[in-house]
A protein has these predicted regions:
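Extreme N-terminal starter segment of soluble prokaryotic enzymes
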Residues: 2-6
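Short, glycine-rich nucleotide/cofactor-binding loops
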Residues: 7-18, 191-196, 267
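Active-site and donor-binding regions of nucleotide-sugar-utilizing enzymes
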Residues: 9-33, 37-133, 219
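A donor-sugar binding/catalytic signature common to diverse glycosyltransferases
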Residues: 22-26, 252-301
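A short helix->loop->beta-strand "cap" motif at the edges of active sites that frequently abuts
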Residues: 103-107, 210, 284
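A nucleotide-sugar donor-handling region in carbohydrate enzymes
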Residues: 112-199
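C-terminal amphipathic helix plus adjacent low-complexity
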Residues: 153-155, 311-377
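Donor-nucleotide binding loops and adjacent catalytic segments primarily
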Residues: 172, 179-259
């Protein structure tokens, strides 16, 4: 009999937390044949990425996953064999007590935020005995073989390659979104938090020698985009042109369509964790807007990733990439940084592709979790 899995997700940062846990739950069901319940405290954050989902349902089945609303007033349920608390969320006290009362305690995993910092390898898989006698294990996603790896479906890169090698597939997908870039335009996606350097980047795109079509899924960055255009907040479907730059606001799409959007673009600016990982799998030059933390703690996290990602670049391309990422995240001139990066475009393209290949050589996160459970028996 297959093990049962419970994944708890408390929505903190809009779509990032639910994005990761929904992908994980889907993969555990589809590729490992597991029975998975996904507990979400805010289903309004879930429905945009899962068309057909009901934000008011206490229970619903979506793509083989038993999706449950995590109510403030917890109703008793039997705990699963494997319990994952995503991103240090606090499980219901009554559920934890039911875990303790089981004849065989479940495997309790704390799925941590993704980080490339050196200390992650030493903490991955460490147990944390609890006062009630249970044991919680810290499970860290990451970029090295001494971590839990990244979320990656088994067929992901093959599907990406087939899509990117088919001009017809790309054109059909973009037309379905109402996107019709002019011939030879650089296609760029932008999914980010508010950023004071947005205007300087847009200025550079608008005055560039190559036409640019900027695709912006609805979200927090749209207000800044509208301000740069001198307009009221742009509704979904809006298309505006300023010199060489065409700006288009897209609707929120499913996770699978978001992957296709990233695959379609020549450059992807992303944020948070879920879209950050998916942009890496897209194999295109990218830019990450990291989530801001107190006392600029996020800068260490940013530089830790860049220390891995930049390996193999020429000194000139390395400096340009570093300058671009720091400009976007540390409030330096994005216009100059963008122009510098464009001078090394072929190398950055090849490097992004090789990075995806190297990361795909490691076990994916879902498989690592399943193996960890089996080894614990």
């Amino acid at each position: 009999m297959n093990a049962t899995w419970d994944i708890f997700c408390s929505v903190v940062d809009n779509y990032g937390d639910i994005g990761v846990t929904w992908r994980l739950a889907r993969q555990l069901v589809a590729e490992h044949g597991l029975a998975v319940r996904l507990w979400v405290d805010d289903l309004n954050a879930f429905t945009p990425m899962c068309p057909g989902a009901d934000a008011g349902a206490a229970q619903q089945w979506q793509q083989g996953v038993d999706v449950r609303h995590w109510p403030a007033a917890w109703q008793p349920v039997a705990p699963a064999d494997v319990v994952i608390g995503a991103f240090a969320c606090q499980l219901p006290a009554a559920y934890v007590e039911a875990m303790r009362a089981r004849a065989t305690p479940p495997l309790w995993l704390n799925l941590e935020y993704l980080s490339a910092e050196d200390w992650v390898e030493g903490c991955h898989g460490l147990p944390s005995p609890q006062p009630n006698g249970l044991r919680k294990v810290f499970f860290f996603p990451g970029f090295t073989e001494k971590t839990g790896g990244l979320l990656r479906e088994g067929s992901l890169l093959a599907r990406r390659d087939a899509f990117q090698q088919s001009a017809e597939a790309r054109q059909a997908f973009l037309q379905g979104l109402g996107v019709e870039p002019e011939q030879g335009a650089l296609l760029v996606s932008l999914f980010a938090y508010e950023n004071p350097q947005l205007a300087s980047w847009l200025d550079a795109l608008a005055t560039g020698a190559q036409p640019c079509h900027l695709l912006v899924p609805q979200g927090r960055i749209v207000a800044g985009l509208s301000q740069w255009l001198g307009e009221a907040p742009l509704p979904v479907g809006s298309v505006r042109k300023r010199r060489a730059l065409t700006v288009q606001v897209l609707p929120f799409v499913s996770q699978d369509d978001f992957d296709r959007l990233l695959w379609s673009c020549d450059f992807n600016a992303v944020r948070g964790e879920d879209s950050f990982v998916r942009a890496q799998w897209a194999g295109q030059p990218m830019l990450w807007h990291i989530y801001v933390q107190d006392e600029n703690a996020h800068w260490e996290k940013l530089d830790a990733f860049l220390a891995h990602y930049r390996r193999g670049l020429s000194d000139e391309a390395d400096a340009a990439l570093l300058g671009l990422w720091r400009a976007w995240n540390m409030d330096f001139d994005m216009g100059q940084a963008w122009q510098a990066a464009r001078q090394h475009w072929p190398e950055l393209q090849q490097h992004a592709r090789l990075w995806a290949v190297r990361q795909a050589a490691q076990p994916d996160l879902a498989t690592a979790l399943v193996h960890f459970y089996r080894n614990s028996l």
